[in-house]
Each structure stands twice: as C-alpha cells, then as structure tokens.
Regions:
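Structured soluble/peripheral alpha/beta segments that form catalytic or ligand/cofactor-binding pockets
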Residues: 1-281
C-alpha cells in the first residue's frame, strides 16, 4: 500500500500515507471549487474526493447556463498515488501549493474543461468542524478556504467559452476528516434527542484589498456551534471579525433567500457590514 508520498518526511502515524488515521468508513479527503463570471449568467462547480475506507474516488463538473444545468460525474477504484489526482478523464495538477492549480477534463459526454486557478489571497485555515449525533461524532473535519481567479476555457456541446481572469472569480476549499458519505449506515437506537438538522451559512467574498470567509453553523434552537468570520488581507494578515449578526432576506411567502445583511466587528470594535444579494432569479 505504499505510494510516492511515502518517500517524503510527512508521516503523522507509523503507517503508509494512503492509510487514514481513522477506520471510520466516512473518512474523506476532498476538494471543492466554484467559478463564475461577474454577470451571474454562468456558474461552474467542480470537485474531487478520495474515500480510502470505501476504496473509491470520484469527481464531478457542473455548469449552469441560465436555467440549463450540464453535469459530468466520474468514479473509479482508489489508488495509492495521491500526488496524481485523477478520476477517469478528470485530473487536478497542483502548480504552486496553496496558490495555483489546474483542472482538466477531457471531452466527456459533451463537456471539456481546462481551467487554471490563481489565489488572489492566501488560504485561511478554518476552525475545526465538529458535529455529534447522540454520543457519536458524525462530522469531524478540517478545512481551508481561498478566493481566487480563473483562466482557461470550457467547451459544452460544441460551444467554446473563454474564461478570462479579469471577470472570472470564485472560491475553493480543501477538507478532510469524517462526514457522512455514501450509503446510510444502520441507524441503531434512535438518538435522544433526535437530530433535527442545522442552519448553515457560508459566505466567501473577494474584494480588491481583502477577502472575507464567513462560516456559521447553528443548532435548531439557535445555539451557534461554529462561528468563523475572517478577513484576509493582501499582505497575508488574517483578522477575526467577531460574532456576526445575520439577517436573511426571503422572497415573500417562501423560504427562498434573496440576500442577507451581515454585521460584524473589526479588532478595534468598528462595525463591518456586508450586504449580500443573490444573483439567481
């Protein structure tokens, strides 16, 4: 079970890198990306994931143009070469770790892509995400996030779309740990109290001089179990923005959000306000 990474002094346990430190079937190691132009008329999401205790890896790329979605999903048996991230016709090449990478999808079901990511700001390490159902940990993950620009092209059903870094931006995150994946496990005795869901807000924003990454997780009773609001400056400084107060705006009579007002506080106690508007109709 050895792989190329085992040549390097990066081990944290007395076992090969490809063996996860946990035997939990839900252990995962995954990347997520999104890309869009500033008009909001086109949106792209993509990702790749490794699930060593399930023996599989998968990837996807989805493009939304107007009201049309076109997607490709790929899956394969896992391998031990984690430096060569690929699933079928999909691959990720890391140029400069934590700064630049390239996503390529050879033509598959009418979709092809060649997209290069360049971070506009440094990555930010988020707080550890932990969630329990009864006595059991169902989510225990580490993530980092980044805002950046995209360049390259997409091809969809014969249409070539140029991705210009002057107008194409997005966010990405890397996460690894434990979270529910794949088929549902036997439930066992029902949890007491039962899991009633959670409220989740994720807002990555890129400005000219800084980026913002906001993650808030609340239980049904409003208890905030994750509060992460940071500002990442061009020079690499990372500033916490306190305990944000959030007001979600909805379409009247529905649960469809149209935007949000987020009020935070900088290190000197000055208010920092963000008005977020949905580009979806």
């Amino acid at each position: 079970m050895l792989g190329p990474m085992d040549e390097f002094p990066v081990h944290q346990l007395p076992q090969p890198i490809a063996w996860p430190g946990s035997s939990d079937r839900n252990f995962y190691d995954r990347s997520y990306f999104n890309a869009h132009d500033r008009s909001g008329d086109i949106f792209v999401i993509s990702g790749i994931g490794y699930y060593p205790n399930l023996g599989v890896k998968d990837a996807f790329l989805l493009v939304r143009r107007g009201d049309t979605q076109t997607a490709v999903h790929l899956s394969d048996a896992i391998d031990q070469d984690r430096l060569n991230q690929n699933v079928g016709n999909y691959r990720i090449d890391v140029g400069e770790p934590l700064h630049s990478l390239r996503i390529r999808l050879d033509k598959t079901e009418g979709i092809a892509a060649d997209l290069t990511w360049n971070g506009l700001f440094d990555v930010v390490q988020e707080q550890r995400h932990i969630l329990r159902t009864g006595n059991r940990i169902t989510l225990d993950a580490q993530r980092f996030a980044q805002l950046g620009s995209w360049s390259g092209h997409l091809e969809i059903d014969g249409e070539m779309i140029t991705v210009d870094p002057k107008v194409w931006i997005g966010s990405r995150d890397r996460s690894w740990g434990i979270r529910p994946i794949g088929e549902a496990e036997p439930a066992g005795r029902p949890a007491d109290p039962p899991f009633e869901g959670m409220w989740w807000l994720y807002v990555p924003i890129a400005f000219e001089k800084f980026s913002i990454v906001i993650i808030i997780q609340e239980e049904p009773n409003g208890f905030r179990s994750l509060n992460d609001c940071t500002r990442i400056w061009k020079d690499g400084r990372i500033e916490q923005l306190g305990w944000p107060r959030v007001k979600i705006h909805y379409t009247s009579g529905t649960r469809i959000p149209t935007g949000a007002t987020i009020e935070a506080t900088d290190g000197d106690g000055n208010p920092v306000r963000f008005d977020v508007e949905s580009k979806l109709p």
